[in-house]
Amino acid sequence: DEPTTDLPICEQAFGDAGLCFGYMKLYSYNQETKNCEEFIYGGCQGNDNRFSTLAECEQKCIN
């Protein structure tokens, strides 16, 4: 699937790992908990709700 670009990044699904089998610890905004949380990204596809650092996620998604 293509990234979900029609929704704002912080409203896209939390922790979309994608279809590949890499192992990258990234951060994603979780709308249910209203926090940025760590998840494992597979390295391809998924959506745009993924950030390299907790600070980057919080800066973008937590007001």
From Swiss-Prot:
Domain BPTI/Kunitz inhibitor: 10-61
CDD domains in the cross-refs: Kunitz_SCI-I-like (cd22634)
PROSITE patterns named in the record: BPTI_KUNITZ_1, BPTI_KUNITZ_2
Molecular function (Gene Ontology), one example: serine-type endopeptidase inhibitor activity
Gene3D superfamilies listed in its UniProt record: Pancreatic trypsin inhibitor Kunitz domain
A cellular component annotation (GO) from this entry: extracellular space
Pfam family, one: Kunitz_BPTI
Keywords annotated in UniProt: Disulfide bond, Protease inhibitor, Serine protease inhibitor
SMART domains: KU
Site, Reactive bond: residue positions: 21-22
Disulphide-bridged cysteine pairs: 10-61, 20-44, 36-57
Known function: Inhibits chymotrypsin and thus avoids the accidental chymotrypsin-mediated activation of prophenoloxidase. This enzyme is required by the insect immune system to produce melanin which is used to engulf foreign objects.
Record protein name field: Chymotrypsin inhibitor SCI-III
Organism: Bombyx mori
